[in-house]
Amino acid sequence: KDATGDIGRGSDLLRRAPKDFLIYSGDDASGLALLLLGGHGVISVTANVAPKKMHEMCVAAASGDLVTARVLNNQLLRLHTDLFVEANPIPVKWVVEQMGLIRSGIRLPLTPLSTQYHSLLREAMQLANIQV
């Protein structure tokens, strides 16, 4: 798993790794790029809140449908970054709560998402067509 977000490093890993060694992106924002370079998948935070769209993006990339993969990735791009405005999994839990999938309430050592990020994440959800 390469979670550096450095496409050059990911490309080098793919070039140097044995053929049977699978390379996964651990960085949502650069996941599509690594897939298109020959990566084998994405270990995704975004998939916790938009699993179908992430799956469709990965399938499109794997099948060579660059147009669809780019459209889907562009819809998810804000989530890829904004889900990290605070320590993971705090923003993810907030989004999933907004989706109505879990009740509110976070246990220590986690703390609630700072209110200053609510509108930012709501906007990212809208761009990804996530229903609340």
Language-model segments: residues:
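Structured C-terminal cap/extension of enzyme domains
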Residues: 29-132
